[in-house]
């Protein structure tokens, strides 16, 4: 996962406070501040503080400081970071040496009169090391370039923003870098039949979903159906674009990092994936889970000679997504229609994909 931090270059305390507020509003997780401003920043909101003080959440030192400070910080459960200005080849060597110390979690690299080459060298040298490489930049374009260097890119970026608009752009960039695209295909509907009542799960999120967006749900790990959000206008009830009526408690849902959970395990504060008709994803936070007894439909579809199944509530407002990317109500499903699925050859063990033979029916 890529991450981003903010650092203000202003000498005015009120402007630095505004930068903290802008960061909070844009969901930036951490900010670099002066040690005498830590208490002030904590009063403004909940954000990780990076500073040259043991009172910070991430303790920061420079090349000139005694690294033993970081040992003490690590012993007390703090995260640690070294800020290095790269001006010479010796600075590059120092950066790679410090990164191999077991009490250093992050290095921040600031370049003088360079952008890419030294970063490439350091990323390549530390490719297999357990260190987070962070680049300091002055604009969002340079942030994007840093994230993409040598395909792997830096783990994080510190942006010195000009204004709130740049902070917001930076936040959007981070989100886009962390999108997980999934490969969707279509399966052919073979059977739809009522199966009685059961405990059905509605996922109410903290995000507004658009037409073409939903979540990947299924009874089997090897094939999940794209269940559409309740964002479609209908004559029966008001839209609920924050909601996916997902199915019964037993079903799987695809979550970030290609993990699955049972619908029954979800709760407020958990993160799940919103997926659109093109396979593009974004994370969202669950605000509420509603489990209620409702009439259910069994849906069977064929993919590459195998039968995939899921169970959904029997209601007009519950929709899958056609192979053309259009929402289609479960009451309108017929044999021969094509719907979007995510096929998967892996089995699941505690939600993690494993290469193991498994029979699901």
Swiss-Prot record:
Protein name per the record: 3-dehydroquinate synthase
UniProt keyword terms in alphabetical order: Amino-acid biosynthesis, Aromatic amino acid biosynthesis, NAD, Oxidoreductase
UniProt similarity note: Belongs to the archaeal-type DHQ synthase family.
GO biological process: amino acid biosynthetic process; aromatic amino acid family biosynthetic process
Enzyme class, first EC level, given as a word: oxidoreductase
Organism: Methanococcus vannielii (strain ATCC 35089 / DSM 1224 / JCM 13029 / OCM 148 / SB)
Catalytic reactions of this protein: 2-amino-2,3,7-trideoxy-D-lyxo-hept-6-ulosonate + NAD(+) + H2O = 3-dehydroquinate + NH4(+) + NADH + H(+)
E.C. no: 1.4.1.24
GO molecular function: 3-dehydroquinate synthase activity; dehydroquinate synthase activity; NAD binding
Amino-acid biosynthesis recorded as keyword: yes
Pfam families for this protein: DHQS (PF01959)
Keyword Amino-acid biosynthesis: yes
Task performed by this protein: Catalyzes the oxidative deamination and cyclization of 2-amino-3,7-dideoxy-D-threo-hept-6-ulosonic acid (ADH) to yield 3-dehydroquinate (DHQ), which is fed into the canonical shikimic pathway of aromatic amino acid biosynthesis.
